[in-house]
Amino acid sequence: MRVGIPTEIKVQEFRVGITPAGVHALKEAGHTVLVQKGAGLGSMITDEEYVAAGAQMVATAKECWDCDMVVKVKEPLAPEYDLFHEGLILYTYLHLAPEPALTKALLEKKVIGIAYETVQFDNGFLPLLAPMSEVAGRMATQVGAQMLTKIEGGMGLLMGGTAGVQAAHVVILGAGTVGLSAAKVAMGMGARVTILDSNLFRLRQIDDLFGGRIQTLASNAFNIAAATKDADLLVGSVLIPGALTPKLVTEAMVKTMKPGSAIVDVAIDQGGCIEPTAKHGATYHDKPTFKYPVNGGEVVCYSVGNMPGAVARTSTFTLTNATMPYMVDLANKGWKKACQDDKALARGINTYDGKVYFKGVSDALGYELHCTCDILK
């Protein structure tokens, strides 16, 4: 199989879809790997390293997109839609629920869209989303701490406080991988932490893990409103795999926040879980924040849709450690046999032959839902 690795074109996206180790694994299995020149530079991977691993370096993205399978990090953007072709296996984060134009293009070109974020084990674990969720969660607290400084428009709080001065209060919506990672960093910085989730079993796990040092609350409108009002930093980390994120924090709730407090909406790539950030839309690393007016001042809001791209080298190697085994399987067996042999990978199928195969996308965009059982017989 011919596997193409184009350069990511999203604004300030520095990750790349494959490492030299991935190239080597595909090459050893008898496949051809085409990497666009310079694709790895944002992750500090040189063209020479790819060549040494067995890749062919090509000048244009089109040469990569003309392959049997394209491996990326972020969802394709409009300039790439014309490069789709029927039967192409596209293996990347897709986040289709809030992307009607991309979904339409994939269906029209009959692309086999396998989304990292919906590959799922029977127990609900998301093996290809978890690596970047861990990075984004850790970043959320670091970014939030900076936003609370006066020079960034915050109220001038030090996350951990000092002797005799109260620490900042970090409120985290969602106790999944993002939320847990954000909580670990916040606790390490000395903050007071509250985490909300609808899964009481998960909250018990969090309580045990941190020895009761984190306040855990059942996620309901009353508790969310109260916690939001008291938050110095609000982190949105709610996830329904592959579906639009529910807007759990309303504009009215945000209006009760203290002037100079901060919001980080990690869920923005699935539509956002906090109304002001969801309405504003994704921001970019070169201008990551915007101000939202509240009584007597403003809240600093951060809604970058590709947070891990800022720490590209860590993110690229973390992600490809997880994606590589499935990538090699797809190349060795073909997409259909690979998905027949692995139920988790089969759940990653979002589009095939002009049809939608993932419920979250179907529900969000109004397409008829088809069952992978019909194509994986």
Swiss-Prot record:
Give UniProt keywords alphabetically: NAD, Nucleotide-binding, Oxidoreductase
Q: How does it assemble?
A: Homohexamer.
Summarize where substrate binds, as residue positions.
Answer: R15, K74
What protein name does the entry list?
Alanine dehydrogenase
One GO biological process term: L-alanine catabolic process
The UniProt record gives the binding positions of NAD(+) as S133, D197, R202, S219, V238, L239, V266, A267, I268, D269, V304, G305, N306, M307
What catalytic reaction does the record list?
L-alanine + NAD(+) + H2O = pyruvate + NH4(+) + NADH + H(+)
